A protein has these predicted regions:
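Extreme N-terminal starter segment of soluble prokaryotic enzymes
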Residues: 1-5
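Short polar catalytic/cofactor-binding loops
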Residues: 7-13
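Cys-nucleophile CN-hydrolase/nitrilase-fold catalytic domain and related Cys-dependent amidase chemistry
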Residues: 15, 24-102, 108, 173-186, ...
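Short hydrophobic-aromatic micro-motifs
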Residues: 37, 139-144, 167-168, 196
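Short beta->alpha transition motifs characteristic of CBS
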Residues: 45, 52, 97, 109-115, ...
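Active-site catalytic loop in hydrolytic enzyme cores
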Residues: 60, 87-164, 173-182, 244-251, ...
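CN hydrolase (nitrilase-like) catalytic-core segments centered on the catalytic cysteine
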Residues: 60-80, 149-233
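C-terminal beta-strand edge segments of enzyme domains
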Residues: 108, 132, 200-265
């Protein structure tokens, strides 16, 4: 399975430019003949315009589905369409849509952990469900940016579905970029799966986004790694490596669930 990540520099609040630019990056990425293309978090609006966010949002993913559904079908490529600022039932969500090779939307996910230090929770509604899906017979999960800091979320997904890979779409800032690298490596290692992150780059307000999109193997090794600027990276994923690792160290067999039911008061 070959993966491409389109590390995109979007313009804050300029949705027409961002949709056109996303199409341009997709058409560049398909030249590498990938099985799956991945985009970053809230690429349609940037993260995030505070003055007129509601007026800039997609509505029920219509524009996103039209663009990526058509591109995925035309080129026969699975697409993890990052996430978009999106209105559903009158409320704004940070929503990810996933498309198969036929252009069909096979899954969607609303970000469950909103980033309170940047007041995301004042503008967006939090999601309430986890999402897993199949692409080319491989079980996949998706999380969005701040979700990565909650290992319980990823472990719940992997225990329920034994994921082959986890997609992480993000707008992670430069000043904490080393933490992104560490957390991605940890999630891949502890869950014995591929972790594919597509981060953004560029600047919004006073925040610089740090790039470092990457593909980590189930051994925790970076097999593709981006710099700080806009670029497309690609990696070939060895489909048998997770099984080989599990034969040596089977962390899922050796789990002790009776010890893990910890709830705060």
């Amino acid at each position: 399975m070959k993966i491409c990540c389109a590390q995109m520099n979007m313009r804050l609040g300029d949705t027409d430019y961002n949709f056109n630019h996303a199409k341009e990056l997709f058409e560049k990425a398909v030249k590498a003949e990938p099985d799956t293309i991945v985009f970053p978090e809230t690429w349609n609006t940037g993260f995030f315009p505070r003055d007129n966010l509601y007026g800039l949002c997609d509505i029920d993913g219509k524009r996103t589905k039209e663009l990526f559904g058509a591109l995925a079908k035309l080129h026969g490529v699975n697409t993890v369409a990052g996430s978009v600022s999106n209105i559903k039932k009158g409320k704004i969500y940070n929503t990810s849509y996933i498309f198969n090779r036929h252009g069909e939307c096979v899954a969607e996910y609303d970000k469950t952990h909103l980033f309170t230090p940047m007041n995301e929770n004042d503008f967006y509604e939090k999601g309430s469900c986890l999402t897993s899906f199949e692409l080319d017979g491989k079980m996949c999960g998706i999380i969005i940016c701040y979700d990565l800091r909650f290992p319980e979320l990823t472990r719940t997904l992997t225990v329920k579905n034994r994921l082959d890979c986890l997609f992480v779409v993000s707008q992670w800032p430069d000043k904490r970029i080393s933490q992104l690298d560490t957390l991605l490596k940890a999630r891949a290692t502890e869950n014995q799966m591929y972790v594919i992150c597509c981060n953004s780059c560029g600047k919004a307000y006073n925040t610089v986004f740090g790039g470092h999109s990457a593909v980590y193997s189930p051994l925790g090794e970076a097999i593709a790694f981006a710099g700080e600027n806009e670029e497309i990276i690609s990696a070939e994923c060895d489909e048998g490596i997770s099984a080989r690792i599990a034969n040596e160290i089977n962390v899922f067999r050796d789990r002790r669930e009776e010890l893990y039911d910890v709830k705060s008061n």
